[in-house]
Amino acid sequence: SMAVAPAAMADMNGYDISNWQCGIDTATVPADFVIVGTTWGSGGVYGGCLSNGVNTDANRQLAGAVNSGKETGVYHYARGGNPETEARFFVDNVRGYIRKSVLILDWEAQDNAAWGDKQWPRRWAREVKRLTGVNPIIYTMDSGYWQVAGMETELNCGIWIAQYATNMVTGYQTAPWNIGARGEVMRQYTSNGSLSGWSGRLDLNKFRGDRAAWRKYANPDDKGAADLPSVKPKPQPTTAPTVDLNALAARTIRGDFGNDPARRQALGGNYAAVM
């Protein structure tokens, strides 16, 4: 099964960007892979370089990554409309990248009317598979994992987990907190990443596999990669590293965690202290 990452391979480092990083030079900001947000909902969303639900800087962002030898992924931000309609909107807008870039669903609480509906990401993934022949990877915050749990075996979807130990500024980490705890293929461990060539903050990720594994997710027919062995999730540690509550409070005020109940989920055990 491809859906669960191996315990030890040549892991890769990368960042994910969206309409908030318009103009970033993906050729020079260091990474093994770059993931680009391409579509939101089924249109009608604007902001940054986002026009009618499409990231107008995505082609340039992806070209810089490809031309500098990086692997790529493209994601769709779920807004919770009809899942098949959103899947088609995504596929229609990333046709040139299918079987070259990993296809991803961004499943999170903010601006998502279907948050909490376990069937929505499954229907979206099935439609993407029907249209492209590719099983997408599913991104969600650790507190939302229950909604997508089982998609690894049901639909052969890799899982990408977001969970932050602290909000301190950091570069790439070799062993992020809790990595592998969900048997995930990829882990996003900060939204306060700092890399040379970009003055803003970035989401940083570790992919638990090598380039051949990445390409196998992008193109299941790729003969260059063997299927990955499956691993059992490790039990979750009971204590998190020290959390910077002031930074969490600042991000809460800024709206990073949305509103209750999503905010309560995102902040987890720090909810009372931050609020």
Task: Give the role of each language-model region.
Residues 6-28, 32, 152-240:
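Functionally critical loop-and-helix segments that line ligand-binding/catalytic clefts
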Residues 92-120, 124, 138:
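Active-site groove signature of glycoside hydrolases
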